[in-house]
Design a protein with these regions (language model features):
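Fe(II)/2-oxoglutarate oxygenase catalytic core
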Residues: 1-405, 409-467
């Protein structure tokens, strides 16, 4: 009895010391910090921080980054654990994701009811926690603990109605944090919920990604087999679309005849590419597209930033315009301004057509549409970022100085459905491209409406090189 009294006195004494220390800290130490923060220098710093906070990543930025990783993962068929370890589509990098990053991805996917892939990310976070990678003090302070990861795993597995594994996850959480009252209460609630769970209770179903798979085709990696007829295509020196090309022909790679798709080489000099990129960096804004109501909007299916430049905006755009006219044989007076576009990590443009008119409206009221698309690549992309044509199974990876060009319309002036294309997600690096669309109106004598693209005597455009 005496020993118990002595022990109780010691505990009370220890508790008293703790309380006193805490009260002193909150009174004396905090007043000292308050006096320090009230100094003019600190007030200036706080005001500066308020302004800087507006430039810091916001909640929407984190959402966009998480969506970019999700789409990239789905497109290239990567496993969550591989991404966390820095193994991206067959290439190992000297970078990894921390447990807190994996947990953030898991929670993002949970908010979308994507339980299967969310489970993958939480498990990747648990494995990342076990890795011996050096973690910064901030990571260690912020967590998450292993108990928090297992707790989240239990929630995901319950939503998947994997009850047995959900209970095991909570048991593992309690093993790592046995005194956590919240986890214990959730575990008890889960056990009671299991007893009352009705078989007819609806499950929050995962979204159907079939449509997204069509919009982000599986061949963005370039590993799909090309059709036999495309393997027989060839490269030529184009010296027929402009007199100057007899002296300096352009290396032209024919990727498809119908629709007509080519790759022009050595079309941009390093100086021109650097000038366009530097002129754009302070002006680019989130890319807009035209919706069904014919209004501009920032759409989720296109994650990039862009800015428009007139053809005569600077010396580089003037030279590119002239060079493009010579290479294609088309009249650049009837073309749109340049659009400089930057795609960051995971940057994507889902499958789409570049034309805006329906075939029944194409020859009415003098409407103008995009006859051809030209895409200048301003840098090499370390991984990802290809342009893919699902209908042709052609994948073109960015290479500095090349220009991808194709006709959106048949020779009779109607939409060619196999010109649907995708800007595949960037895995590593950043992609800089310049688009220039060439109008159909004004090209009547360069590329007239014909019944067949083989009627060579009427053509003066780039298609002459295949005849």
């Amino acid at each position: 009895m005496r020993e118990q009294l002595e022990k109780r006195k010691m505990e009370e004494s220890f508790d008293l010391f703790n309380r006193y220390s805490f009260i002193r800290h909150m009174q004396a130490n905090w007043l000292m910090w308050k006096r320090y923060l009230d100094k003019p220098v600190i007030l200036d710093e706080l005001n500066y921080r308020k302004v800087e906070n507006l430039r810091m990543p916001q909640e929407l930025d984190l959402f966009d980054a998480s969506e970019a990783i999700r789409r990239m993962q789905a497109t290239y068929g990567m496993l969550s654990n591989d991404i966390a370890k820095g193994f991206l589509d067959g290439v190992q990098y000297n970078s990894t994701l921390a447990p807190i990053d994996c947990l953030a991805m898991g929670r993002h996917l949970m908010n979308q009811s994507r339980w299967t892939i969310a489970e993958q990310w939480i498990l990747a976070g648990i494995k990342a926690h076990d890795r011996k990678d050096p973690q910064t003090e901030m990571m260690l302070l912020r967590g998450p603990t292993k108990a928090e990861l297992f707790r989240t795993l239990g929630k995901v597995r319950f939503e998947m109605r994997n009850i047995g594994e959900a209970l095991k996850a909570y048991q593992a959480a309690l093993k790592h944090s046995p005194r956590d009252l919240e986890i214990f209460q959730e575990y008890q609630n889960l056990k009671r919920r299991v007893l009352t769970l009705s078989p007819s209770e609806p499950i929050r179903e995962e979204p159907n990604d079939d449509i997204e798979e069509m919009e982000l085709p599986p061949c963005c990696s370039g590993r799909c087999e090309r059709p036999q007829k495309l393997k027989r295509l060839y490269c030529v020196y184009n010296c027929v679309t402009a007199p100057f090309l007899r002296l300096a022909p352009i290396k032209t790679e024919i990727l498809s005849v119908d629709p007509f798709v080519i790759l022009l080489h050595d079309m941009v000099s390093p100086t021109e590419g650097a000038l366009i990129r530097s002129s754009s960096k302070n002006q680019i804004l989130p890319s807009e597209t035209v919706n069904a109501a014919n209004e501009f909007e920032v759409a989720k299916f296109r994650t990039s930033k862009s800015v428009w430049f007139d053809s005569d905006a600077n010396e580089a755009t003037l030279k590119l315009t002239q060079r493009l006219g010579e290479a294609t044989g088309l009249d650049m007076k009837h073309s749109e301004p340049f659009q400089v576009i930057n795609y960051g990590i995971g940057g994507v443009f889902e499958s789409h057509f570049d034309t805006s008119l329906a075939d029944e409206d194409r020859f009415v009221n003098g409407y103008i549409d995009r006859l051809a698309t030209t895409l200048f690549y301003l840098n090499d992309v370390p991984q990802g970022g290809a342009t893919h044509f699902p209908g042709l199974n052609i994948t073109v990876f960015p290479k500095f100085g090349t220009v991808l060009m194709w006709y959106n319309l048949h020779t009779e002036g109607l939409l060619h459905v196999r010109t649907m294309h995708t800007g595949c997600p960037v895995i590593v690096g950043s992609k800089w491209v310049v688009s220039k669309w060439i109008d159909d109106k004004g090209q009547e004598f360069r590329r007239p409406c014909l019944r067949s693209h083989l009627d060579s005597k009427y053509l003066s455009s780039i298609e002459k090189i295949i005849i």
